[in-house]
From Swiss-Prot:
The keyword Glycoprotein is annotated on this UniProt entry: yes
Glycosylation sites recorded in the entry for this protein: 111
InterPro entries named in the record: Ammonium/urea_transptr, Ammonium_transpt, Ammonium_transpt_CS, NH4_transpt_AmtB-like_dom, RhesusRHD
SUPFAM superfamilies the UniProt entry points to: Ammonium transporter (SSF111352)
Residues spanning the membrane: 28-48, 52-72, 114-134, 142-162, 176-196, 215-235, 243-263, 275-295, 299-319, 335-355, 395-415
BP GO terms, sorted: ammonium transmembrane transport; response to symbiotic fungus
Keyword Chaperone in annotation: no
Record's GO cellular component terms: plasma membrane
Name by which UniProt lists this protein: Ammonium transporter 2 member 4
NCBIfam families for this protein: amt
Length: 480
């Protein structure tokens, strides 16, 4: 039986390419992109005080654009290209037609798809770092920090863990979709950069939800983040397979469990549940399951949700207020707790719950000496040593990511502050968006609201609308 003409290989659809896999990978990449733009843009712009809404959203928006430009120019090849040293690839462009239309190093789709998919992950990582720096970092310093960090920090961790030639990848570390590469890195780097930049002005350090300017929009941004995680974890196998389906289901089950536990703890200890708490529980659940999504069973995903909803809650709500060092570092979006702590937890729990069969299906290797969770190693005679080894590798990767990011992020901050101040000056800290961008996110609330009649181009400097002709409708008025 002959195949339909649209399924036959041709120059645009080579024999090696699977159209279904390619379509899913592009969809997954777009979903991850939507987590950033507009997901985190909305979330950041809504969680901060209204005087910092524009700046917070802009930092995320700029980071995404800047990273993608660096990514195709040199960073992709440094992360996944030909090995230069054991932890880094050779810098090179990823824009050549011959390269982009060729087969990716994994999956049955072209390099162009892989470059885009991995690029949106890199962009998201920098936006997560921004969450620890909102409300006081000099925007010019941020514009320098972004390309430097993606070049000298992200690429090293990505190559080491995700590239087949990376030293931790060869060791057998399990990081299904970025618990180490993205979340642990972002949490540690954000916390380190926050140390160097310093805290926000006292007036801006109100606790949530008092500082939040629009809680409904917080939920909108959080919803985009949550649903976009279907592409985040579901695209990790690089194939539209059963493992992708399992990863997506585990992601949402773990997240639901984490939210439930966090909200219950808030209710028990503080007397009432909060939207802010639910969103934090959502993030910790999503982060914790990320390194394990497609290689653990459903019941393990629920247990991981219980743990991710409780331990980060304790470190954030209790321990943070008791440890002087933690109190001194201003982390507006609690990136350290929701990403560094939750990411490290996820990595350790992955080493415990990873199912050998699922790992074999994901990594497509017959090597049973690797990728064996400790829980399964203890159940099988002769595999205990392999399970213990896997836990050691997982912890080894955590130590590497933490140490490298603290060192490199500190070095980048020190270099940037030689060029421009890391921190905004006093006037800008007091004024916020108006001083930095000359824009106001909430013009209706401005003390100097002005209305312009578009047809006559007349400006009314008063809130008394009696001077406006009755024939003019509000639809013809525009705020300035």
């Amino acid at each position: 039986m002959e195949l339909p003409s649209n399924l036959l290989p041709d120059e645009a659809s080579p024999e090696w390419m699977n159209k279904g896999d390619n379509a899913w990978q592009l969809t997954a990449a777009t979903m991850v992109g939507l987590q950033s733009i507009p997901g985190l843009v909305i979330l950041y712009g809504s969680l901060v005080k209204k005087t910092w809404a524009i700046n917070s959203a802009f930092m995320a928006f700029y980071a995404f654009a800047s990273v993608l430009l660096c990514w195709v120019s040199w960073a992709y090849q440094m992360s996944f290209g030909e090995k230069m040293v054991f932890f880094l690839g050779k810098p090179n462009v990823a824009l050549d037609e011959k390269f982009l239309l060729g087969k990716a190093f994994l999956g049955n789709f072209p390099n162009a798809t892989m470059v885009f998919y991995q690029g949106v992950f890199a962009g998201l990582t920098l936006i997560l770092i921004a969450g620890a720096l909102l409300g006081r970092m000099n925007i010019r310093a941020w514009m320098l920090f972004v390309p430097l960090w993606v070049t000298f920090s992200y690429t090293v961790v990505a190559f080491s863990i995700w590239c087949p030639d990376g030293w931790l990848a060869k060791r057998g570390v399990i990081d299904f979709a970025g618990g180490y590469v993205i979340h642990l890195s972002a949490g540690v780097a954000g916390f380190t950069a926050a140390y160097w930049v310093g805290p926000r002005a006292d007036k801006d350090r109100e606790t949530f939800p008092a500082a939040t300017n629009n809680m409904i929009m917080v939920l909108a941004g959080a919803g985009l983040l949550w649903m976009g995680w279907s592409g985040f974890n579901g695209g990790a196998p690089f194939v539209a397979s059963t493992i992708a389906s399992l990863a997506i289901l585990n992601t949402h089950v773990c997240t639901a469990a984490s939210i439930t536990v966090w909200v219950m703890l808030d209710t028990f200890y503080f007397g009432k549940p909060t939207v802010f708490g639910a969103v934090q529980g959502m993030i910790t659940g999503l982060v914790c399951i990320t390194p394990a999504a497609g290689v653990v069973q459903g019941w393990a995903a629920i247990l991981m949700g219980f743990i991710s909803g409780s331990i980060p809650w304790y470190t954030m709500m209790v321990l943070h207020n008791k440890v002087n060092f933690l109190k001194k570092i201003d982390d507006p979006m609690a990136v350290f707790h929701t990403h560094a702590i939750a990411g490290a937890l996820g990595g350790i729990l992955t080493g415990f719950f990873a199912v050998p069969k699922l790992c074999r299906l994901f990594y497509m290797v017959p090597d049973w000496e690797k990728y064996i969770g400790l829980a399964y190693g203890l159940q099988n005679k002769g595999a205990t040593q392999a399970g213990l080894k896997q836990m050691v590798i997982q912890i080894e990767a955590i130590v590497f990511v933490i140490c490298y990011n603290v060192l490199m992020t500190s070095l980048i901050c020190l270099i940037v502050r030689v060029i421009v101040p890391l921190r905004l000056n006093g006037d800008a800290l007091q004024m916020g968006d108006k001083a930095i961008h000359g824009e106001d996110a909430f013009a209706l609330h401005s003390e100097a609201t002005k209305f312009v009649n578009i047809k006559r181009n007349q400006v009314y400097d008063t809130q008394d609308f009696s001077s406006i002709p009755e024939s003019r409708s509000l639809g013809e008025l525009q705020m300035v």
